[in-house]
Amino acid sequence: MVVVGGGKAVREIELNNANKNPALEHWDSLQIMTENAIALMSHFEGTTMASTPFKKASGLFFLDAFQYCKNDKTINGEPFLPQTRDVRSDSVALRFAQDFEFSALYLLKSVNFPASKNWEDACNQNYVDRFFYKLFNNKKHNPTIYTINLRSSQTVQPFNSSNKV
């Protein structure tokens, strides 16, 4: 499953909106992630756009982040992930991996992993979005998380990332 980020288009929304409407910014960002996934999918044969319900199968799947988050609700019917700028592609990817009990999650980044002792520290250094560590620490078991810097050769499993820190 590939969860594509929003990139520069989301950064522009963040700069232009400056907390005017956090929920709208959140959903616009998810829509951009989905549009980026569709664009990236066009470069691969035999890919599938996925949302929920999702059935694990072999193949290359791209997540429709907007639709997945729209369908991902708490018992009270509220969206599972907060509708704020604290939630971006990192948290969406982790939530999907938790939801479908994936054993591993690979975060593809454009910077090296910072000198961090846990995910909260990595959030504070803007390596992952601000909700990531809260989502991570809310689960007893998580996928093993690897980070890969696409602009260098760094591939790491930062810490025992499959359990709460």
What are the roles of these predicted feature ranges?
Residues V2-K8:
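Glycine-rich beta-strand-to-loop/alpha-helix junction loops that act as flexible
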Residues T47, F100-F102, N138-T144:
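Structural alpha-beta junctions
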Residues M1, L60-D64, Y106:
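Structural motif
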Residues T84, S91, W119-V165:
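Polyanion-binding loop/helix "lid" in catalytic or ligand-binding cores
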Residues D99-K117, I148:
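Glycine-rich phosphate/pyrophosphate-binding loops
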Residues K8-E12, F113-A115, S152-T155:
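Short, active-site-adjacent cap segments at secondary-structure transitions
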Residues I13-F100, C123-N124:
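Ligand-binding beta-strand-loop-alpha-helix segment within the catalytic cores
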Residues Q67-K70, V92, S110-F113, L150-S152:
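Short acidic/polar capping segments at secondary-structure boundaries
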